[in-house]
Structures are given as C-alpha cells and as structure tokens.
C-alpha cells in the first residue's frame, strides 16, 4: 500500500475522570502525548500536530520539539477540535488528516500510514478507519468493544456496542443461557472497530455544523453522526489487533512495561 501525503493530529484533553492529567503522564521520562507524537513521526506523516485546550500540554510538547496548537476548551468532541485545527492551519479541502488518539503511545506507525492511504484510495468516502477480527467471545458481548459491519465495498454499514452481526442460528436461547466463554463465534467474522480515523479536511470543517444523530446519542458513538447525514466511511480490515490505550492507572502501568519491552527490541 503506497503512502498518501497527510497530517497527523493528536487531540489531547487534560481533563480525565479516571486518570487525571493523562496527556502528561510520564512514560520513560517523557509525557505520554509526546510519546504518541514520536510514534506518529515514525509514520509517513508530513506533519504531526498536537491539538490541546491546555497550555500545560502545549508547553510540554514545545519543550520536546513537538508542534502544538492551542484550541478552544468548549469542543464537544475530538473531531470538533480537529476541525478547528484544519481551519487554523489553512488546510485545503482535499488534505488528509489522521486523528491519532493521544492515549495510544504504542500505536503502530504503519497503521497510521495505511488508514491515510485507505482514505486516499476511496474518493467516495469522507472518512476512513480500521477494524480487526474478534477471536474472543467476551469481546463480542462487551459493550466497551465497538463492532462494525461492512458492505461489499468495505464501507461501514453500522457501528454498535451490541453484538454485531447477531448470529441468530448460532446464539440460540440454550447457548445464551451458558457462559459467555462457551458461546461460539459465528461463521461471519465479527469485526472490532479500531479508534483511528482519517478525514478529508473539507469534511472536518463541515462536521461541527452537522446536527447530532439520535443513534449517535443512543450508542454514544460519534462516527454515527457522519453516517446519519449520508457520509461514507471506508474501513480497512487488518489482522493485527492494536495495543490497548491508556484509560486507567492500571493501563498506564501496563503501557509503561510494554514501552520498556519496545525499547529493548528496537532501541530508543
């Protein structure tokens, strides 16, 4: 897959209920948001920008020579924050912007490249994202694991926290009465959505004007707003599950250990 010119933007909010000051959490001597930016710089991104509403995060980025844009504090979502950045940077409508989550310091640079290229290869779509097959029944029935089903052209038909698709002939009442671990996976692959997005800058600027969708509010999945308003989302399916992000102190401990292993394998 050839690389598409793109900009990587990392939204970073300081407020976090489960892990205060999360973007500034230390990972081997540097703030987590800086570690994410370093991973993004290992991709083919022409530019890597942190978008934050906190001066302390912007200052930390600048101390480590990471470009940062200070955005408004009243954005309802990370996508709204990206829309402001697209305007501030004066990006042309056809520019590709990849939203890299600020709490995923272990993200694979190749995944960033591939999602950007996937959007370039689907000119009929405003957004591209990624998914991978689920192999653990517990994940299928976990509402914190978002599922996606695709059409024949690998565009998203629906995202949901519910088991999707519902395997009617496999998950019989007798099977559902048993433990989750004993429920077989259906013949059709169940795909887990990976929270990375590539957007066209023109769509980003339109997004804040789109009314919230009832299904978006019910599922609490922001990407459903775009689909509700008729936008198409191209989905790249990958066999490799990405490393989990950081939401809790326990996650941070796990990621610090994984980072140390990464350094041992690849060097600093």
Swiss-Prot record:
The keyword Nucleotidyltransferase applies. InterPro entries: Cytidylyl_trans, KdsB, Nucleotide-diphossugar_trans. GO terms for molecular function: 3-deoxy-manno-octulosonate cytidylyltransferase activity. It holds the Pfam family CTP_transf_3. One of its GO terms (biological process) is lipopolysaccharide biosynthetic process. The keyword Transferase applies. It catalyses: 3-deoxy-alpha-D-manno-oct-2-ulosonate + CTP = CMP-3-deoxy-beta-D-manno-octulosonate + diphosphate. SUPFAM superfamilies: Nucleotide-diphospho-sugar transferases. It is found in: Cytoplasm. Keywords: Cytoplasm, Lipopolysaccharide biosynthesis, Nucleotidyltransferase, Transferase. Transmembrane segments: none annotated. Its EC number is 2.7.7.38. Pathway: Nucleotide-sugar biosynthesis; CMP-3-deoxy-D-manno-octulosonate biosynthesis; CMP-3-deoxy-D-manno-octulosonate from 3-deoxy-D-manno-octulosonate and CTP: step 1/1; Bacterial outer membrane biogenesis; lipopolysaccharide biosynthesis. GO terms for cellular component: cytosol. Belongs to the KdsB family. Activates KDO (a required 8-carbon sugar) for incorporation into bacterial lipopolysaccharide in Gram-negative bacteria. This is 3-deoxy-manno-octulosonate cytidylyltransferase. It comes from Ralstonia pickettii (strain 12J).
């Amino acid at each position: 897959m050839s690389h598409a010119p793109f900009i990587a933007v990392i939204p970073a909010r300081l407020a976090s209920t489960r892990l205060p000051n999360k973007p500034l959490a230390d990972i081997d001597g540097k703030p987590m948001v800086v570690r994410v930016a370093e991973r993004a710089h290992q991709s083919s991104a022409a530019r890597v920008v942190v978008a934050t509403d906190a001066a302390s995060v912007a200052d930390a980025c600048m101390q480590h020579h990471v470009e940062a844009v200070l955005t408004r504090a009243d954005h309802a979502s990370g996508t709204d924050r990206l829309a402001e950045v697209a305007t501030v940077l004066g990006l042309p409508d056809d520019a590709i912007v990849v939203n890299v989550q600020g709490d995923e310091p272990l993200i694979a640079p190749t995944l960033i490249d591939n999602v950007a290229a996937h959007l370039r290869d689907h000119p009929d779509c405003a957004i591209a994202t990624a998914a991978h097959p689920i192999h653990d029944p517990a994940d299928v029935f976990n509402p914190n694991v978002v599922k996606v089903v695709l059409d024949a052209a690998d565009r998203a038909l629906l995202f949901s926290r519910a088991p999707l698709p519902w395997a009617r002939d496999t998950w019989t009442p007798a099977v559902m009465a048993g433990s989750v671990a004993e429920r077989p996976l259906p013949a059709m692959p169940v795909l887990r959505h990976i929270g990375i997005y590539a957007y066209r800058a023109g769509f980003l600027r339109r997004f804040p004007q789109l009314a919230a969708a009832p299904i978006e509010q019910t599922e609490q999945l922001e990407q459903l707003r775009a689909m509700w308003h008729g936008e198409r989302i191209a989905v790249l399916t990958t066999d490799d599950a990405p490393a989990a992000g950081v939401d809790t102190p326990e996650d941070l401990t796990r990621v610090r250990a994984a980072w140390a292993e990464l350094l041992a394998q690849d060097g600093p």
